[in-house]
Design a protein with these regions (language model features):
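N-terminal positively charged helical leader segments and presequences
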Residues: 1-86, 245-252
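Active-site helix-initiating loop/hinge in glycosyltransferases
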Residues: 3, 103, 219-221
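RNA substrate-binding interface of SAM-dependent RNA methyltransferases
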Residues: 8, 12-16, 27, 32, ...
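Structured adenosyl-cofactor binding patch, chiefly the S-adenosyl-L-methionine
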Residues: 13, 113, 118, 128-140, ...
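Short glycine-rich anion-binding loops that position phosphate/pyrophosphate groups of nucleotides
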Residues: 26, 52, 70-72, 98-100, ...
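Short beta->alpha connector loops at strand-helix junctions that form conserved
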Residues: 48, 69, 96, 122-123, ...
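Short basic, glycine-rich beta-strand/loop surfaces that mediate nucleic-acid
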Residues: 55-70, 137-140, 183-191
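Active-site/ligand-binding-proximal alpha/beta "capping" segment
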Residues: 167-217, 221-223
Length: 252
């Protein structure tokens, strides 16, 4: 993973780190991360910016990357168990074949901030959790249960059987998101940027809602639309437990 916030969140989450990579010109600015790594006896390796870009696969690394042990993927059942443990109605985000890593990362960041218990997404035809997606999430991936599934429609059907309502977005829906009841156990499904919800996924939705547009642009992108729905669901559920932070960060 690369970028200051993802590395910070990985340390906070206790991810097993193997080494910290920093560019010499940014080492002073990254002093806190370097000190933290040194305290944990994690090797700190200096690497030129161009080489770090080659290692991470993108140039938005901010001069720092963390080589860490891979996290074991979660299962949908783990997400529901977390909600039960926290004494809350389950709130799940489902991604239906999104293609843009930035949209994926932004949605994960919004999901974590809105109190989502976990995210399900297909193992195929889905933008990977690349360094770019992880950086766009500002490290939210370290705190979310992420469950890749082979059969997204089947997973949604199973969650419906377990008592969760499945809500998707559709510009032609008769009900607006503000009119919809988004309390109780819920899955919010966000379709791909170009095609929206796949037909098989749409058939698994108990409810379709739209976000009214007042300007000339006819739709929002997937990340913005999903964030609107997630925070509407959070608002309808009332205030959750207090968390550290909570202020917008314009530099991430």
């Amino acid at each position: 993973m690369a970028g200051r916030h993802p590395v910070e969140e990985a340390f906070l989450a206790g991810r097993r780190a193997l080494r910290l990579l920093v560019t010499p010109g940014r080492r002073d600015a990254l002093e806190r991360l370097v000190l933290h790594a040194t305290t944990l006896r994690i090797p700190v390796v200096e690497i030129e910016g161009g080489s770090l870009t080659a290692v991470t696969g993108f140039d938005g690394h901010q001069g720092v990357a963390l080589v860490a042990a891979a996290r074991a993927p979660a299962a949908p059942a783990d997400i529901l168990a977390r909600a039960i443990e926290q004494g809350e109605a389950a709130l799940v985000l489902a991604l239906d074949s999104l293609e843009d890593p930035q949209n994926v990362g932004t949605l994960l960041r919004s999901a974590e901030a809105a109190g989502v218990h976990g995210v399900v997404f297909p193992t195929r035809r889905q933008a990977p959790l690349s360094p770019a997606a992880i950086k766009a999430s500002a490290g939210a991936t370290e705190h979310l249960l992420l469950a890749p599934v082979d059969d997204l429609p089947g997973t949604l059907a199973d969650m419906h059987v377990r008592g969760l309502r499945v809500v998707g977005t559709d510009a032609g829906a008769s009900l607006t998101y503000r009119e919809a009841d988004l309390q109780g156990p819920l899955v919010i499904v966000i379709g791909s940027e170009g095609r929206g919800l796949a037909p098989a996924v749409r058939r698994r939705c108990d409810l379709l809602v739209r976000i009214p547009m007042r300007g000339r642009i006819g739709s929002l992108n997937a990340a913005v639309a999903g964030s609107v729905l997630l925070f509407e669901a959070a608002a309808q559920r009332g205030p959750g437990p207090a968390r550290a932070g909570g202020q917008p960060n314009q530099t991430s």
